[in-house]
Structures are given as C-alpha cells and as structure tokens.
C-alpha cells in the first residue's frame, strides 16, 4: 500500500504531497525533510529503492524533480517504479512536455492526475490512454 507520494525538486521544495496515511503536520514535515535527505544524496549507480523507517521509498529522478512513493516493505518495487514512470508520461502528455512550473501553477490538475491513477493507496489505473481521456473530459467541463 502507498503511504504517501512526494514530488520534490533538488532544493527540497515540495511540489506535490499526497498522503494516504494519517500523519500530523509536524510528522509530515519531518518525513518530507528525511525523504529529501535520503534520496538526493544517492548516486545514480544505486538502485531506486531505499529502506526508510518501516517502509520503502521508491523514487525516480526526472530532470530536477524527484518523484517518490513510500510503500510497505513487502510491496512490489518494480510495479511502483513503473507507476512513477507511467505517471510522468501522463503528465508529459497532458501538459505537452511537462516542467516544474507546470506542477507549480497547475497543481490542482496534477492532483487530479494523481487521483485518476492512484486510489486509497493503491494503483488504480495503468492505461495512459484511459487516464488522458478522463482528464480531457474533465477539462472540457471547466
């Protein structure tokens, strides 16, 4: 099960935080800082999986952004690594070559993409076509 999803830049600024487990605000801030500290110092030669507390962080770096998913230790690493890649591809298609500013200024759309792809801490949809179709339909309602 997914505990939380974070998108952070190299400076540690959080661009998206989606929580599927209840944490108080101080704990959330501490987790954000710890995840950034763990992920940013890792060499590109290392795996994209990190043991973290009683969980596991699965992350992928795209340009200057780190896409991180915290999951249970027994979950499938590769499934979540592929889910991150799928998520980035959907964002790239939806925003026509996504960049960090798209995430900042269109954060509500990014949360919509997350909600279309993940539900209650599980991967909900893996078809990029279906997700994009749903997003375009929602956009037409605006």
From Swiss-Prot:
PTM-bearing positions, type Phosphoserine: 140
Main location as per UniProt: membrane
Organism domain of life: Eukaryota
Stored InterPro entries: AP_complex_ssu, AP_mu_sigma_su, APS2, Clathrin_sm-chain_CS, Longin-like_dom_sf
Subcellular localization(s) per the UniProt record: Cell membrane; Membrane, Coated pit
Key words of the record: Cell membrane, Coated pit, Disease variant, Endocytosis, Membrane, Phosphoprotein, Protein transport, Transport
PANTHER family: ADAPTOR COMPLEXES SMALL SUBUNIT FAMILY
Subunit organization: Adaptor protein complex 2 (AP-2) is a heterotetramer composed of two large adaptins (alpha-type subunit AP2A1 or AP2A2 and beta-type subunit AP2B1), a medium adaptin (mu-type subunit AP2M1) and a small adaptin (sigma-type subunit AP2S1). Interacts with CCDC32; the interaction is direct and mediates association of CCDC32 with adaptor protein complex 2 (AP-2).
Function: Component of the adaptor protein complex 2 (AP-2). Adaptor protein complexes function in protein transport via transport vesicles in different membrane traffic pathways. Adaptor protein complexes are vesicle coat components and appear to be involved in cargo selection and vesicle formation. AP-2 is involved in clathrin-dependent endocytosis in which cargo proteins are incorporated into vesicles surrounded by clathrin (clathrin-coated vesicles, CCVs) which are destined for fusion with the early endosome.
UniProt protein name: AP-2 complex subunit sigma
Annotated organism of origin: Homo sapiens
Gene: AP2S1
